[in-house]
């Protein structure tokens, strides 16, 4: 359905931009599963909140080894319902998000770009943030050179707008 929707939008002279929230997820996401939605659900791995052996364990930064039901993870601006994603320690998460960056701007979906939520707050350091967005842009532009990378940022965006990270 989505590919047909985008095609119809394009026929009408409009563009489709996806909202990418790559800084954090919800505490209900299967990766963390703080609400235990998937804990006993068939076909789902245990979330990182539930088990230290979760395949998603490295997707988050835990401050204490207190499983099961580990509340000691970093949240975006301290919000425990918005667990911050931990790209620096998780090549698996990084690769997964780069795959997503490419997938949606490629056929059959052909969306026209990404709007990036709280983009400058992504990693634990500005150096890593710049590295991540350079790789994100490279992946998007290799898949669709016409796709736009539009970021939400509060403050001076100059260092992000050098032609190798965000378009605007």
Predicted regions and their residues:
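Proline-rich intrinsically disordered, low-complexity coils
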Residues: 55, 68, 83, 91, ...
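Active-site-proximal helices and loops of the catalytic beta/alpha 8
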Residues: 6, 10, 23-24, 29-59, ...
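Short, flexible, mixed-charge acidic loops at enzyme active sites
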Residues: 61-77
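Short, acidic/polar
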Residues: 90-107
């Amino acid at each position: 359905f989505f590919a047909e929707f985008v095609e119809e939008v394009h026929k009408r002279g409009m563009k489709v931009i996806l909202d990418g929230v790559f800084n954090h997820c919800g505490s209900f996401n299967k990766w963390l599963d703080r609400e235990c939605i998937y804990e006993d659900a068939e076909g789902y791995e245990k979330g990182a909140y539930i088990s230290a052996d979760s395949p998603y364990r490295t997707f988050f930064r835990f401050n204490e080894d207190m499983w099961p039901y580990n509340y000691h993870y970093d949240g975006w601006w301290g919000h425990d319902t918005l667990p911050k994603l931990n790209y620096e320690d998780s090549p698996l998460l990084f690769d997964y998000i780069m795959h997503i960056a490419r997938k949606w701007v490629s056929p059959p979906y052909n969306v026209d770009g990404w709007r990036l939520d709280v983009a400058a707050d992504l990693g634990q350091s500005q150096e890593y943030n710049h590295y991540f967005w350079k790789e994100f842009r490279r992946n998007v532009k290799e898949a669709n050179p016409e796709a736009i990378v539009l970021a939400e940022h509060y403050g001076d965006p100059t260092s992000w707008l050098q032609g190798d990270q965000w378009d605007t």
